[in-house]
Amino acid sequence: FDEACGNRPKSKDSDDFEKILFLKEEDNFEDNFLIHTISSYHTKITEQIKSAKKVYLSDNGFLNLGINRTINNGVMLENEVFVVLNKFCEELTYIKENYEIDFRCENSLYQVSYNIEDEKTRQREFRAFENFDSEKRYKYKIITYDETSLSEDIEIIKYEDFIFEFEDTKRIN
């Protein structure tokens, strides 16, 4: 309340205290499965632990709780893909080097884009794979809202098929 009113005094000690409170708050949200965080992929575990975290919500409904209620289909789709991958991947990370890869799960790299009809968007998504994995050690997958195709070595999967692919895997195991 004080922060919203803008009348709270600031000091180094209060800033440190504020950081501690926020961390405890974030931990509470994580402990209660409202938010989840993933680390940036790195070959050294200490670097991975120190990396900036990406935050995802356990339910897209929480995206409507904020002040800014404009619908961002790309953010919602990426969050939904996270929810699915988080159920099935033992070590889910993202990659941030020159370009960002949304998810790394075992032997697959995932990019999420609501729509890749625009050539610039398509090239941006493809370039991220090429930049990180020049040796082609991973399977490349782009999850979109409504497109399915195979382009070069990249599988483009519509979200609906992506979900069923993982559900079928779950039934087999």
What kind of feature is each model-predicted range?
Residues 1-105:
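Accessory nucleic acid-recognition modules appended to NTPase machines
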Residues 39, 96, 144, 157-160:
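Short loop/edge segments at beta-strand edges and connector loops
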Residues 56, 110, 141-143, 155-157:
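Hydrophobic/aromatic beta-strand patches that form the interior of the parallel beta-sheet core
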Residues 85, 110, 129, 140:
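Hydrophobic, well-ordered secondary-structure elements that form the walls
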Residues 96, 135-153:
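Nucleic-acid nuclease catalytic cores
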Residues 106-118, 125:
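Active-site ExK catalytic segment of metal-dependent nucleases
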Residues 120-135:
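Short, charged, amphipathic alpha-helix that recurs within catalytic cores of restriction-modification
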Residues 146-173:
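Domain-level recognition of nuclease-like catalytic cores that cleave nucleotide substrates
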